[in-house]
């Protein structure tokens, strides 16, 4: 079977056209007429006085009934309200209605009183209107409203096409993305090159009896470029690209998701060779049988249909299914077996080189200054995803526009990086002089402990400008190189640096504040990881006391207890010991360098922000002064 290339000019898609072009207009006209009729009826009833039948008989005897009409259900007409006060004036007449009672003498009473009366028989048209048309119209309006509600806001979605797939079809001209637009994930691109080559040259693989994976699962934290990679595969292979989110399959009605899966693969077969991309696969691919909630049947039917479609279509049809998720651990095992999503491509956070390449990709089309150093930014943004870096460049462009500059400068990138890391400046948050001084000592305490610790990361900036929601100041440390392993000494130094702010407060004021809350949280987390994960405790041994944490994007610190009570007590004592020892070490460092602590704090209070060069310059000047004065003492 030979695969024919897709046509360049695909016919326009009509999935979104409403089934009846004038349906909305007809419904609106019907509603308007119905409301006008109700309004007229309400006005008529407002002018009619309803009286009891006994009063109606009394008015007949008093000859106050002028005329009346008799229907099967009621009697209505005109009655005299009051006689004219003067001659020549007309009498006051009002409309009335009363319930008809089975009274054989009614006609005689009307004749004797001289009342003009008659009988009214309801027309066949009104009977049909009230018996059939109005109920059908109300039912149709409810049905139409429900159909629009279930449509999810898209034009043309209704109960008539609720089982249609909502996949968006892009052809090679409209994807606009190739592998040149993707950076920072070279290994993932290499894995997907095979898929592209198969779509371009399928005969070479079939001649060797090779089978391309039916499904490729892109796994990685949010923002790492999984969707962009899928578009790049379609752009490189120049084949139609169906894109849909997993949440778009599932609706309120059971069976809709399965119908949409069938419709999606039906469209894909008609456009083969092509790529079907399902974003957020975990929305429909969760493990079956573990949820007890409303809607479980719909999720499971949708998943079952997806399993059937992936294992049922002919492998020579040229349909490649790409999917993305950041929670592979909750996917059903049947999805990951050979024959379905049998290949997993990890799209991890980029390293320093990858971040630099991503920055260069996102900087295309932006006016940049000649002094831009992407390498410096890349080294300083460890842990940033591709989306974070794109946001960083956008923030830099906004800052440059705010300065009314025609180009993006390095200072804009650095300020944008700080804004992303620590939050925007809170210029409206005004601190008292005492609080400002305490914050300065706190931040300088962090910086000095980091500077005099052998394995701590270098200090890049110290600031007492409030940022974000709660930060009154911050000390920015940036690594000099990408690290994949951390030694025990490095971890202990990180704890010691975190304790530096609290130690400085106690040393200067003899009192402590709530400002070290986040520092204590960070230090405790590192200490717990050392004891429970890395076997670095003295008495806890080499056992691993924490269950696996499969969620991507970092370790979950809500540890589950998987040890005896005695072992848990030992772990708590080990953690407490590590924290206390490093707190005392931070105190010792600051006592030995208390002059530096006061001098740097004095400069920080004057300038509010010190960069790495200024910080080092102050310390070097103090060091020179110490050499020139032999009696210089730095002990507290």
UniProtKB/Swiss-Prot annotation:
One of its GO terms (biological process) is protein catabolic process. The keyword Iron does not apply. The chain crosses the membrane at residues 19-39, 127-147. ATP binds at residues 220-227. SUPFAM superfamilies: FtsH protease domain-like, P-loop containing nucleoside triphosphate hydrolases. It is found in: Cell inner membrane. InterPro entries: AAA+_ATPase (IPR003593), AAA_lid_3 (IPR041569), ATPase_AAA_core (IPR003959), ATPase_AAA_CS (IPR003960), FtsH (IPR005936), P-loop_NTPase (IPR027417), Pept_M41_FtsH_extracell (IPR011546), Peptidase_M41 (IPR000642). Its cofactor is Zn(2+). It is a multi-pass membrane protein. Residues 1-18, 148-636 are cytoplasmic. Keywords: ATP-binding, Cell inner membrane, Cell membrane, Hydrolase, Membrane, Metal-binding, Metalloprotease, Nucleotide-binding, Protease, Transmembrane, Transmembrane helix, Zinc. It holds the Pfam family Peptidase_M41. CDD domains: RecA-like_FtsH (cd19501). Acts as a processive, ATP-dependent zinc metallopeptidase for both cytoplasmic and membrane proteins. Plays a role in the quality control of integral membrane proteins. Homohexamer. In the central section; belongs to the AAA ATPase family. This is ATP-dependent zinc metalloprotease FtsH 1. It comes from Methylacidiphilum infernorum (isolate V4). The gene is ftsH1.
